[in-house]
Amino acid sequence: MKYQQSEEDYLEKILMLSEDKQNIHSIDIANEMGFSKPSVSIAMHKLADKGLINMEKNGVITLTNEGYKKASAVYERHKVISEFFMSIGISKETALEDACEIEHFISEETFNAIKNFKK
């Protein structure tokens, strides 16, 4: 389960970085996440082997269609959960931290209930 969480965190970070930056490299991800470049490089190769990202020879990293779908789903869960927590009075910092953990393990039923409750 731990690897899946790490994988999802990397995909989500690539998606978030791609909103502001055209060319994403391992060093960008390492800097954002506070990990070493070698650790990120290993993770990127694993994601590429799974067909979730493309790594060009110049080091540019992009999400594949499958990677984009996974990243978008995680990002949506993160946003909905953190917004819900803040709406019930939890501080932004705590809401974001808790959402980052919960987004990986929440059931579809519970997530949909939170999403629909917000409407």
Descriptions of predicted regions:
Residues 26-57:
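Canonical helix-turn-helix DNA-binding module
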